[in-house]
A protein has these predicted regions:
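Extreme N-terminal starter segment of soluble prokaryotic enzymes
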Residues: 1-4
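Short glycine-/small-residue-rich Rossmann-like dinucleotide-binding loops
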Residues: 10, 46-49
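Short glycine-rich hinge loops at helix-strand junctions in the catalytic core
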Residues: 24
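Short acidic low-complexity segments
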Residues: 27-38
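Short acidic/histidine-rich motifs immediately flanking catalytic phosphotransfer sites
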Residues: 36-46
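Cysteine-nucleophile active-site neighborhood
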Residues: 48-119
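Active-site oxyanion/phosphate-handling segment shared across diverse enzymes
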Residues: 118-142
Length: 142
């Protein structure tokens, strides 16, 4: 299997590569169109603000490649947010538009934002895609 980690310019690529290697797959970190198009799986990592990430993706010519991808694509952290239409962060920025949703700041008085750490998973989605995503995860698992 050819797994590609997109070189977004705004992510901890070594940490993700290590995690993928633990699954028995040697990932390729790249921004090359041919590598991305020939991948079996694509990882879209991200750290920082949506605006900075979209600027970095655009400078690397990645938005259209990501939008055209037909392979399974996993957005991690900010990478998942980038799949939406628009983020209200830093005054608003257009995103990749692969998911019909806007990214909005959580209204969580008294809770630290951003939240980092481990939480138990309690899926509440009934769509076929969500059921597939959570197929082997029981409610309450880490």
């Amino acid at each position: 299997m050819k797994a590609v980690i997109l070189d977004t310019g705004c992510a901890n690529l070594a940490s993700l590569a290590f995690a993928v290697k633990r699954l028995g797959v040697e990932p390729l970190i790249t921004r090359e169109a041919a590598d991305i198009r020939s991948a079996d799986r694509i990882f879209l990592p991200g750290v920082g603000t949506a605006k900075a990430a979209m600027t970095a993706l655009t400078e690397r010519g990645l938005p259209e490649l990501i939008r055209e991808a037909h392979q399974p694509l996993l957005g991690i952290c900010l990478g998942e947010q980038l799949l939406g239409r628009r983020s209200e962060e830093t005054g608003g920025v257009d995103l990749l538009g692969l998911i019909d949703a806007d990214v909005r700041q959580l209204n969580a008085p008294g809770l630290p934002l951003p939240h980092m750490g481990w939480n138990r998973v309690f899926p509440k989605f009934e769509s076929p895609q969500a059921k597939l995503l959570f197929k082997n995860i029981e409610p309450g698992e880490w």
